Amino acid sequence: MLALLLVYVVSTIFSAYREDAFTGEAGRNNGCLIMIVYVAVYFIITREFSHWEYLFVAFALGSGIVFLLAVLNFYYIDPLNMYVGYEPADVENFSSTIGNKNLVSSFICVCLPALMLLFMNTKNRLLSAIYFIAEVLGFSALMVADSDSGFVGFFALLLLVLVYYIRKPNYMFKYFLSLFSMLLGAKVLFVFSVAAQGKVKELSSIPSFFVYTNGLSFVLILLTLILCGVFFIISRKNAEALLPKAVFYAAAAVVAACFLAVVYMIIKYTFIDTTSELNGIPSYFRFDDKWGTHRGYIWRKSFEIFLDANIKDKLIGCGPDTLVYPFTPFFAELASRFGNDSTNCAHNEYLNYLVTTGILGLAAYLAVIASFIVRAVKYAKHNPLIIVCAGSVICYSIQAIANITQPITTPLFILMLCIGEALCRQCKNKKTVANG
């Protein structure tokens, strides 16, 4: 974390836009100043954290309220009068107390994995019920937030959790119970949509698949119910049963095959078959300038900016959160082709770090995340809350491929990382004392 802060400080000092690099005002307020705060919080929490039993209960209740508001907003129900003064077009993209649907999705990607893993790991029935209700609400909120980054992040996380717990039937029972309930909850959204006589916000192809009357989605619901029953029966016979390692390898192979299939589809429709018309979900496999609300164009130009940069900017970037300046020459084309006259970020956290803090900044950031995940896997068996935090960090990190860093939901991601690190340190210290 100190290495990341050092890069931020050096990048700010040598930036041509020093003041904006410090405050982040030219971008999303993610300048050097907020990184100083993040690092201070990191060292305070990782050294002084003391777990309170109901910390995550408060987390579940708070996030549950945000989820519920997002669902109500889907039906144009505005209990907090948040829509007052907004144009109709803005109301369509406004959700819960956060606003922008991409930021709501980012929030969900921090909270929902943690809630699901808390439910899977908690034996207290009351707490399990709280986490269960919150996770079902969270999935419904993910559907109505309707952000591609959120879908990618959470669905990828589901596959990783499947592989991690596949040998433990008692955990897999709760895993498939969660999936069944979340998928069923999405159908409840449809029931209320009918009751609302169609007065709801429009959904894109992915959430429409889960919410509306798609035959395959009902097959998924039935499949999760069957698997839930199978693992329940196995776990009832032996609560501590452990399936053979072959099951783990088979699950890992299936997940790897899914990943390779996605890569193949992307390569096929992006580089080989570039003319076939794609609609709905298949359209996500063709990466071009229009992809992801013209994120494809912004990504391509941002990478070109990096490639054309001098050696200093390649190493430490143009200054934290100052992408708007090197991107300014492309504003006219952005406006003529897509109707947006400006952008101040790459809409990809890693690409944004690459341009604004250089190779060193991106490497330091990735090292922070990767080192925590490695430690989390190592110490999770000693404290299940570690894997809860790791789930949040992984899900957020995946959705960040198509989202932005900002001081609204990113601090929550930092907090989960800090708590996870603190728990790892505590496990390590206990192990050292035991061995000493």
Regions found by a protein language model. Name each.
Residues M265-Y284, K290-L307:
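Juxtamembrane membrane-water interface segments immediately following transmembrane helices
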Residues L2-S15, G31-I44, E53-V91, S96-N238, ...:
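Alpha-helical transmembrane segments of multi-pass inner-membrane proteins
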Residues P88-V91, L216-S217, I281-I298, T328-P329, ...:
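Luminal/periplasmic active-site loops of membrane-embedded glycosylation enzymes
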Residues I233-A239, C424-V433:
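Membrane-interface capping segments at transmembrane-helix boundaries
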Residues N100, D289, T293-S342, T357-G361:
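TM-adjacent membrane-interface loops and short helices in multi-pass inner/ER membrane proteins
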Residues F22-C32:
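Non-cytosolic membrane-interface motifs at loop->transmembrane helix junctions
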Residues D20, V91, R337-T343:
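Membrane-interface amphipathic/re-entrant loop segments adjacent to transmembrane helices
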